[in-house]
């Protein structure tokens, strides 16, 4: 999804220290996922709503069905993630969302909801590249990983 479609112009990400709380949104394909993370590594909540059953009879993900399901699920999943983390909007320092690559309709649901919260809460919106996020997720498990490194990154079906 490019900057023209999402309004997610490249910006400097907010400085993350051990107390920074980010609400992260992921809707690039067929799962609606929201997590609250403190300090870049401490996962306070992670809520995932799968659409596997919706797409099973088609033998793969149907983009329009995925987008409509995200539209129905995004607010309840966000609310549950905040509730499970014991947070509300005034506790959140930034809102991040996957901006691509992915299914355009699915991405727009997540980006729109995330940007709306960032605007309402007057906090930065951080655009996240889906593939880069897969790479950096390894640091959650092993924060001492060092560059340079060789990575095989496979995503999707």
Regions found by a protein language model. Name each.
Residues 1-157:
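Short acidic/glycine-rich loops and adjacent helix/strand connectors
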């Amino acid at each position: 999804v490019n900057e023209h479609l999402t309004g997610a112009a490249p910006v400097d990400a907010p400085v993350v220290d051990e107390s920074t709380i980010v609400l992260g949104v992921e809707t690039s394909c067929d799962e609606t996922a929201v997590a609250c993370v403190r300090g870049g590594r401490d996962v306070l909540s992670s809520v995932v709503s799968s659409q596997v059953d919706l797409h099973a009879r088609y033998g793969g993900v149907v983009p329009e069905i995925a987008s409509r399901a995200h539209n129905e699920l995004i607010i309840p999943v966000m609310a549950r993630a905040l509730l499970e983390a014991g947070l509300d909007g005034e506790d959140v320092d930034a809102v991040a969302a996957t901006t691509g690559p992915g299914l355009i309709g699915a991405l727009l649901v997540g980006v729109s909801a995330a940007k709306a919260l960032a605007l309402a809460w007057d906090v930065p919106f951080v655009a996240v590249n889906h593939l880069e996020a897969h790479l950096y997720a390894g640091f959650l498990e092993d924060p001492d990983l060092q560059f340079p490194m060789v990575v095989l990154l496979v995503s999707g079906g």
